[in-house]
């Protein structure tokens, strides 16, 4: 399952 990632 995809993991939520904030910022870049």
Curated annotation (Swiss-Prot):
Further facts: Found specifically in cells cultured chemolithotrophically.
Task: From the Swiss-Prot or TrEMBL record, give the protein name.
Answer: Chemolithotroph-specific protein
């Amino acid at each position: 399952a995809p993991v939520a990632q904030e910022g870049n």
